[in-house]
């Protein structure tokens, strides 16, 4: 092809990009490649990843040590659950009746000496316990949602990978590379939905602008004009035809109602919205359910429970970094925004609402739910006032449910003070491999027409977690 023809094509492609948003084009790119391979996805599975940004205390939630000294066990009591022998925090009254729906892992661990949010988040979300590249560098390891978008893009008119409310950042808590897609590229990065000032528990919540058509008549005219130009210039060129097909799919995705409706909680009954809880975490989990129901493959939900009513300055968009007084966050066992008395009942309501709703709608078989922080908390309660706990990567707890995960079991153990794993450790690598396996993502298979030449994880799925 001569230089003139190349420049002419580039000009037309640039013009076409102006008609449709880059986010919308990225939404359909993976689906376009899937169609060309001619391979059908056996089951359209999705994942809701509830990220408890900051790292909750495992000792005060799901791995309680009631016989340990008070300075270790903390002030809360465990309660019995539907599963004999499984005991959880007394404020998890609704989850206690749903323990047959999920598996509780009490042996999560980070190898090495991680102690900060950035590295722990990066290892957890990338599924690799390797040193991260400098923040924002595109050659770094992609996160789970990016790989899932690459291998199993949505086949419907909606995004494949979404993140509901960024954790506080930068530089606090926020995973360093959530917005770039790592070495896969920005087309596989998540679409960000909402913020601390714009979330679905608010009456005026505004969804992302990827479905904003602007002047629809003008858009239609531009589409017609571009089609006329392409028919004369690009129709004889294979790449040009591919572009035309991709543009039409993007236009279709923008103009059909399914994508927009997924973000509209007005379609839900008042009873359902109340069931999840009228707070950021509850309404975001309801939004996540609507999104996977509409075809989104991977939704990360920031586990922010909101700002306590009496707090004049609560957390911007995180809840679980409960240091107590040594960082000015208030009593970790109190009722403030960084207090378990405020956060745990809201987590109980929102998560039990999600699990029950998925079960009733017949969505559990094809929806994986993961609930975890990036690490746990120190066995010893800090002695300064008000009390709290520091970061602890050696041992923490997670919940998995759906997509073949067995219910009613506790996997792994920690020692008598919850400081170290004593059996069946699960690193970020094993957790990632388990998630990929549950979603039918091929592990370490660079020949799968994906263009990926590096393994997506070095871990192996924990098959004992599956029912």
Model-derived features: where do they sit?
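Ligand-binding pockets and gating/stacking loops
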Residues: 1-467
């Amino acid at each position: 092809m001569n230089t003139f023809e190349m420049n002419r094509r580039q000009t037309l492609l640039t013009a076409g990009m102006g008609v449709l948003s880059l986010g919308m084009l990225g939404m359909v790119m993976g689906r376009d490649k899937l169609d060309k391979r001619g391979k059908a996805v056996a089951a359209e599975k999705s994942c809701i990843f509830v990220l408890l940004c900051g790292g909750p205390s495992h000792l005060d939630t799901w791995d309680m040590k009631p016989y340990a000294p008070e300075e270790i066990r903390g002030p809360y009591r465990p309660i019995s659950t539907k599963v004999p022998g499984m005991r959880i925090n007394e404020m998890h009254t609704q989850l206690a009746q749903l323990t047959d729906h999920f598996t509780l892992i009490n042996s999560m661990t980070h190898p090495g000496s991680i102690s900060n949010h950035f590295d722990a988040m990066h290892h957890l979300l990338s599924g690799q316990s390797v040193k991260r590249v400098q923040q924002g560098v595109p050659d770094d390891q992609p996160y789970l949602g990016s790989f899932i978008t690459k291998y199993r893009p949505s086949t419907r008119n909606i995004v494949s990978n979404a993140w509901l409310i960024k954790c506080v950042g930068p530089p606090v808590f926020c995973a360093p590379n959530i917005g770039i897609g790592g070495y896969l590229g920005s087309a596989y990065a998540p679409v960000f939905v909402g913020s601390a000032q714009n979330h679905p528990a608010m009456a005026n919540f505004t969804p992302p602008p990827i479905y904003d058509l602007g002047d629809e008549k003008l858009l239609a005219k531009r589409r017609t004009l571009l089609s006329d130009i392409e028919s004369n210039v690009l129709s004889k060129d294979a790449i040009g035809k591919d572009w035309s097909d991709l543009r039409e799919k993007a236009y279709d995705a923008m103009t059909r109602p399914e994508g927009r409706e997924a973000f509209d909680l007005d379609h839900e009954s008042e009873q359902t919205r109340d069931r999840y809880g009228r707070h950021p975490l509850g309404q975001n989990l309801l939004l996540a359910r609507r999104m996977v129901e509409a075809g989104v493959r991977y939704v990360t939900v920031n586990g922010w429970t909101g700002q306590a009513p009496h707090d004049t300055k609560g957390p911007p968009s995180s809840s679980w970094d409960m240091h107590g007084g040594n960082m000015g966050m208030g009593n970790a066992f109190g009722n403030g925004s960084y207090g378990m008395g405020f956060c745990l009942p809201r987590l109980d309501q929102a998560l039990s609402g999600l699990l029950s709703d998925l079960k009733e709608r017949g969505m559990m078989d094809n929806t994986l739910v993961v609930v975890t922080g990036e690490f746990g908390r120190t066995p010893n309660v800090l002695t300064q006032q008000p009390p709290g706990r520091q970061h602890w990567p050696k041992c923490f707890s997670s919940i998995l449910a759906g997509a073949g995960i067995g219910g009613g079991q506790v996997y792994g153990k920690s020692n008598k003070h919850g400081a170290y794993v004593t059996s069946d450790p699960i690193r970020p690598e094993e957790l990632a491999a388990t998630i990929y396996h549950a979603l039918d993502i091929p592990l370490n298979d660079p020949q799968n027409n994906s263009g990926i030449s590096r393994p997506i994880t070095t871990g192996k799925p924990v098959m004992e977690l599956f029912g």
